[in-house]
A protein has these predicted regions:
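DNA major-groove recognition helix of helix-turn-helix
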Residues: 62, 73, 91
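A contiguous catalytic/ligand-binding core that recognizes phosphate-bearing ligands
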Residues: 49-55
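Short, intrinsically disordered, mixed-charge
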Residues: 51, 63-64
Length: 149
């Protein structure tokens, strides 16, 4: 289960372990916190918004500086988005053929916790995702049990 989640989000073992440790420190259910942190990563938000075809492509868009958060360039894929933040593509990225294709052809529905705007070039984090809104087929309790040994 851990490997399934880790590969789905494209994280190294160290990144995943750190995420678990922070989720464990926070109040609430550790497994849900962990999935929420995974979903709120900037590369995942770009993917969920339909700006990229895959999480790897979303990670590359972020790494290459094509993404703004609240008007400022952010090139760290692990950046954790907060409620109310606006994630948008920079002007140069909006003209890229691959980005246009992703938005037009894939036409992916964004989850309920994201609000689309500006022809798919912008997305607002409306609320923090809850477990029901996260569609990754992972049993997070097994991950928590593995790491809590």
């Amino acid at each position: 289960e851990k490997q399934k989640a880790r590969f789905s989000y494209g994280l190294t073992e160290r990144q995943f372990r750190r995420l678990y440790e922070e989720a464990n420190r926070r109040q609430g259910v550790t497994g849900e916190n962990m999935l929420r942190f995974l979903e709120l990563r900037l590369d995942n938000v770009v993917y969920r918004a339909g700006m990229a075809a895959t999480r790897a492509q979303a990670r590359q868009l972020v790494n290459h500086g094509h993404v703004d958060v609240n008007g400022s360039r952010v090139d760290i894929p692990s950046y954790r988005c907060k409620k109310g933040e606006v994630v948008s593509l920079r002007a140069k990225a909006r003209k890229m053929v691959v980005v246009q294709w992703n938005i037009d052809v894939l036409d992916r529905q964004s989850p309920a916790w994201l609000e689309m705007g500006d022809n798919g070039h912008e997305v607002t984090v409306r609320e923090l995702p809850v477990r029901d809104q996260i569609d990754i087929p992972v049993r997070e309790q097994l991950i928590v049990e593995l790491y809590s040994k």
